[in-house]
Amino acid sequence: VERGKDVRTRKVDLANISRTQNVDPESNYCFGEGGAGAYSDGKLYTRSKKRGSIEGILNLFCQHGASPTILADAHPHIGTDKLPRVIENMRNRIIECGGEVRFETRMEELLVRNCRIEGVRTDKGEILASAVILATGHSAKDVYRWLHSHDIAIEAKGFAVGVRLEHPSELIDRI
């Protein structure tokens, strides 16, 4: 379940933000396939102490179209121009394996019976599932409010903000 749009359609919405200053609350820099990082600079970075298998994750990116150079780079970088295609390839592989992706679908609540998760209720109906993974990013305040109101423990995570500066190549060449 993804409240935003697919990574390609989302690109149109991001261009619209720049052109008209109108922000679609469900398809913007925070919401949509690939999350906040999909249209960042393409750097792969974690501050988490729970790092897991970084090599495994980098291999997964390579299997879906990232350059194998990220396996050896001290600071792996896929690039803004390539990352959306890698994300799209990952989604297509999930679908090939029998998974399903529902875009423009908002989770409204978890279905819990007898202290067990049984699925989710969305704005488009119920989806039953034996397991649910919430990968909300940092801006799904409605989800956090719902979890809090149902006494489900949540933990705050640090927030990082980056800045991207673009300069004409002539200026950079002079420097």
Q: Model-derived features: where do they sit?
A:
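Residues forming the flavin
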Residues: 1-43, 47-175
